[in-house]
Amino acid sequence: MALKITVIGTGYLGATHAAAMAELGFEVLGLDVVPEKIEMLQRGEVPMYEPGLEELLRKHVAGIEGSTGRLRFTMDWAEAGAFGDVHFVCVNTPQKHGEYACDMSYVDSAFESLAPHLHGPALVVGKSTVPVGSAARLAERLAELAPAGEDAELAWNPEFLREGFAVNDTLHPDRIVVGVRSERAEKLLREVYVTPVAEGSPFVVTDFPTAELVKTSANSFLATKISFINAMAEVCEAADGDVAKLAEAIGHDERIGKKFLRAGIGFGGGCLPKDIRAFMARAGELGADQALTFLREVDTINMRRRGQMVEMAREALGGGSFLGKRVAVLGATFKPDSDDVRDSPALNVAGQIHLQGGQVTVYDPKGMANARRLFPTLGYADTATQAVRGADVVLHLTEWREFRELDPAVLGEAVTSRVLLDGRNALDPEVWRRAGWTYRAMGRPTA
């Protein structure tokens, strides 16, 4: 008999996972406690922008004409408990307010709500990013609360999704990591992931703490690589070097690789910043704080880049005050192909300049609604051309394809001064300079 799957939490991770499980052929029930979110999903609408996700949802959501009907949604914990053989917990784990540590309240609440409705054998699978040691604690709590007792097992299966590529990353993962305590749990998860494993995705079986550490270790490594190249950009600026050529050269070394070597204003979003901080906090609790002290410098370098972009803008305007100066910001999301503005370096820079008196106008292809909610006092435009109209300086802060394809000559007709600061090192300097622009980027020669 085919497995039935529930997905607890239908945000970015949960909605993607639920749709992907339906695509893999399973009957899926998604649960959330927010009525508006459930109503949207039942209509086949996605509460966030993620390429390909809405199409996948509409292909499977019950009640939509032509769908497979394999995917339904509910707010009823009892229904979810009775429905699923495997329950994936995909709720958020934000940073605690005023602390580095991870806020586990959503995860704890999900377990407390689901467990009393598990009356028969079930596997609860955590996918959220949690501090190491959480799975062992949750396994004990699950056994205490579930009527099924020890027949309600726990496994940990960290997610490795990239916003903008989430559907592909779920259906065709570059690895599947499972932390289990029994052969039964491993067998069930192999059954869940039989299709991607058959297509060549590695299936790594380990224990709870290692599975938990894999996710935070991966994010910490990526954050370190980004901050490393940004540190090299600072050295290049001091030595009149070119960080883009430096990155190209060291990227040819197969031990290093080319990815995550583009210097700029640093990383943001809802994962990397809070994950490395929570990792440091947990290491301190375990008495291993010295092992991760380097991550504090990784975080410091990353945050410093935002301030450096503000200073570059000030210098481009003559080195004085921002008062009365018009600043156009291209980009609001923390990365392209997403509408996520959480801890966005672009909005952080825009906000700093606004607070210092600059007249800031922002444009982003997908992040405008979220940006307006987070920074209502900034100015916003409906197009890039509108955003730069009358600008004294233009800041390119999110590397959307739309911005890479802009015509510098056309844009130049709208601005007061043809000055471009490329905060992502993603535009072609020569194309912009030939169109009469002064082009500057972090870690690059000024001419």
Cite the ranges covered by each PLM segment.
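Structural/interface elements that position substrates and couple domains in central-metabolism enzymes
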Residues: M1-A447
